[in-house]
Amino acid sequence: MNKELSFEEGIEHLERIVRELEQKEVPLEQALNLFRQGIELVQKCNNQLDYAEKQMQILLENPNGELEVRPADFPVEG
């Protein structure tokens, strides 16, 4: 995977891999290679989601009843 894939491209590629693996005539070596690629894509997409979560902001009401924007405060693994 030389090219940086967007999240959506990664999911599409992962779906293609799953469809190909579901075919019964896939040789073992090819299936293992596809499985490895799929695992790499899942990790990449998870990292992209984690990054997006870090960038999100949550609109909250402060004690004065005013709305304020604060960074989301939830744990992100990575």
From Swiss-Prot:
Name of the featured protein: Exodeoxyribonuclease 7 small subunit
UniProt-listed GO biological process terms: DNA catabolic process
Swiss-Prot/TrEMBL catalytic activity: Exonucleolytic cleavage in either 5'- to 3'- or 3'- to 5'-direction to yield nucleoside 5'-phosphates
A molecular function (GO) term: exodeoxyribonuclease VII activity
Superkingdom, taxonomy of origin: Bacteria
Its EC number(s): 3.1.11.6
Enzyme class: hydrolase
Subcellular localization: Cytoplasm
UniProt-listed InterPro entries: Exonuc_VII_S, Exonuc_VII_ssu_sf
SUPFAM superfamilies, A to Z: XseB-like (SSF116842)
Keyword Cytoplasm in annotation: yes
Quaternary structure (record): Heterooligomer composed of large and small subunits.
